[in-house]
Amino acid sequence: PAIILNNQISDRYYNKNACGTHITWDSIRALDDYYWTDYNESCLDLVALANISDNMNITSMSTRATINIGLSNINNTMFDTIIKSQEYSMKGIVTPHNVAFSVTPLINAFLRLATFEERVLLMNAFCGIDHEVFEYTKRGEVFPIEENIYEHMIRLFTSYRGKQNRMRDKALPILMKEAEQQY
């Protein structure tokens, strides 16, 4: 069986400014109420990340509150590691703006260029499946160092973000030239 929720066409779903993750979280909240459990609060930080990354309208009080509470209570180790890796560009302050312009671009670049296996690693990292150890040999070094999945993902994020930027910089003059020829 499947549960299908479409907040855009349902008369019973009040928040039209929520992303799919937020709607799923609302469903988890309802299940928590029904079964007397409390799983929903542990993933509120990821709901905030999804609402920000999907560029959702935060005029909805529910969406805004979810973002504010989620960013104030970061529980997910992968999300926390990404934030720490961007501490300099974020000036040590976690805001929706800083997440949108420092965290989201890293994740997006990675997802655009990563292999299927690397995407599975990212899912494992966000799910806290962190038993795997990776070996990495720095440029100019002889001996490899060991890194956990979170360190490994940050290195991949940074690498793919740089690669994406180089691809953009290489393509931009070509696109500009084509645009000038057309207009």
Residue ranges, per PLM feature:
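Short alpha-helices
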Residues: 2-53
